[in-house]
Every structure is written in structure tokens, then in C-alpha cells.
């Protein structure tokens, strides 16, 4: 005759439940470690590549005064980010594809930053990483076995501080178009912070262990998107660039070729 099962309120069940929760936490923690190690690796590659090119070719920093087309590269990470989000788990978890994303965004970021200056780039880099760490930290304060109370508190505090800061800066802005640009930036960044917040929760609780590359891409591409959008706000010289110079070099060479024929 089989021995009777222990009662649901018995110490044996409590120990088994605690062990089960501990094993689940270890599995999720291993996934998180892999995802965020990949994110740090992607950021390190992009930072090293962009730093070497940006500092190694100083003559190219004024390229946007004659050719404004690098500004269009602000849309590159946004399109890739939407692609990764829309495809979801159907997106290939492939090393070659992931490194292709990192390489493409690193190259476009170099051309894009040539339209700005070093102080704005460094401030932007620090600000975006701080926002990302704050969003990620707000999610990681609570785990999947506890109430989401701390997540709610941290997210509301972070949102309040962000919008109060934005309102103070906007109130001191003289020109109307600058205020519109600043508030538009705030709306976009708030949307991206919200996606980052819930995306981090998804990675923490639900991301399959076989999809760590896709999880790291979600975070990395979102960071590059925030970096490029923020750089526009921190670089007033970009607001005054004439859009008539977009593809100016291509149009001039085309006209010369057409004139010669």
C-alpha cells in the first residue's frame, strides 16, 4: 500500500515548494546573466568601434555642414527595434545575425555622431545608460515570486522625476520650437522607457532560455535608439542644419555627370 501524501500545510510541502521556487529562480537568473552579459558585450563593441573611428578621423566631424543625410540614420535603430519586437519569438536567435545588427548600428552611429560634438555625445551616453539602469533596476527590485509593489513604486518615482526635470528645462527654454522639440523628445523617451520596463519584465519572467540573443538585441537596439534621439536634443547645431543639403554630394555628382553627358 502506497504511503499517504503529505498535507498541503505540512512542512514537507513547504520545503518542496521553497525548493521548486529556488530552482526556478536559478534558471531565470542564469538567463538574465547571459542576456545582460551579451548586452554589455554589444555596448563595449559599439563604444570601442565608434570611439576609435570618431577620434581617428577628426576631419569628418564637420561633414553635416555640407551633407545632412547622416541625420536620417536616426531611423535605422528604430526600424530594427520594431522588427525585433514585431517578430517576437519568430525572430532568429542567430549569432551571425546578432553581430550583423551590432555592426550595422555601430557604423550608423559613427556617421550620426559626426554631426555633433564630443561633450554632447558623452552627456548623451551617460544619460541613456543611467535611464536604462534605472528602468532595469526598478524591475529587478522585485522578482517573479513577490508582489510587484516595488516595481510600481520605483516606476512612478522614476517617471515623476523625469517629467519634472523635463518641465523645468522646458520652462526655461526661450524659443517655442525648442520647447516643442523637448516635449516631443520627452514623449518618445517615456514611451521607450515604458517598453524597456515591460521588456525587462518579460526577459526576467518569460524569455525562453534559447532566445537570449534576441533578448539582448531588444535591450541593445532600444539603447541605441534612445541614444540617437537624445543626441538631437543635446546638440542645438543639429536643429539649424538645412535639410536642403540632404544627399547634396550625390545630387551634385549626378548633376555633374548629367551635365557632362
UniProtKB/Swiss-Prot annotation:
The chain crosses the membrane at residues 37-57, 68-88, 95-115, 121-141, 150-170, 180-200, 215-235. It is a multi-pass membrane protein. Keywords: Host membrane, Membrane, Transmembrane, Transmembrane helix. Its main location: host cell. GO terms for cellular component: host cell membrane; membrane. Disulfide bonds: none annotated. The keyword Transmembrane helix applies. It is found in: Host membrane. Belongs to the cytomegalovirus US12 family. This is Membrane protein US13.
